[in-house]
């Protein structure tokens, strides 16, 4: 087990054959215990609080039972590092600056980095957002990456290839694969 880094999400459940995002603490706890059982381990390295894209959601997570549970699991050694996943640099920045997370899972790629902050992650795929000339990194994203570096918050990347779009010349906002 010591040769692997396990990253797993809190706040996700599998119900009736479907993924569901949840902040209901009973579901969060049951899902996490089920995860440990299914992975046949007594701890995970990174407990990633799933999909926090709005400031309101971050405030609810940070000040509510989800963060309290994550910290409790960390104190018990069931989670080594607390993480958070987000597509929105504004919400992610709040989390990073709070000191409550050790790891940020963030959508990083050459096209998304040119997009401004948005609470709707589906806007990242909207073609009209790429109609304007994209020449500079979004300042909020640049500040987020610098802040993570300065505060020692690790970044784990999601959507490095934009869900595959960046590998397809016709789908890539850059017009090249």
Regions from the PLM with identified roles:
Residues 1-8, 42, 75:
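N-terminal binding-site loop/beta-alpha segment at the start of enzyme catalytic domains
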Residues 6-8, 45-48, 84-85:
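Beta-strand segments within the central parallel beta-sheet cores of soluble alpha/beta enzyme folds
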Residues 9-11, 49-50, 160:
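Short loop/turn segments at strand-loop or loop-helix junctions that form parts
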Residues 23-40, 86-94, 176:
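Short, acidic/polar
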Residues 34-58:
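Active-site groove signature of glycoside hydrolases
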Residues 52-177:
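Beta/alpha (TIM)-barrel catalytic core signal, keyed to glycine-rich beta->alpha loops juxtaposed to Asp/Glu
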């Amino acid at each position: 087990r010591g040769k692997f880094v396990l990253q797993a999400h809190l706040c996700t459940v599998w119900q009736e054959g479907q993924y569901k995002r949840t902040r209901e603490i009973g579901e969060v706890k049951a899902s996490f215990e089920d995860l440990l059982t299914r992975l046949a381990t007594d701890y995970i390295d990174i407990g990633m609080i799933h999909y926090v894209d709005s400031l309101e959601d971050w405030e609810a997570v940070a000040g509510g039972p989800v963060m309290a549970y994550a910290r409790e699991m960390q104190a018990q050694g069931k989670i080594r590092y607390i993480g958070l996943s987000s597509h929105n640099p504004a919400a992610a920045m709040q989390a990073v600056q709070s000191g409550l997370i050790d790891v940020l899972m963030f959508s990083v790629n050459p096209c998304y980095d040119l997009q401004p902050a948005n609470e709707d992650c589906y806007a990242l795929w909207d073609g009209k957002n790429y109609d304007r000339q994209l020449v500079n990194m979004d300042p909020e994203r640049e500040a987020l990456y610098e802040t993570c570096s300065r505060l020692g918050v690790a970044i784990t990347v999601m959507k490095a290839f934009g869900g595959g779009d960046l590998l397809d010349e016709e789908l890539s906002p850059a017009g090249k694969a």
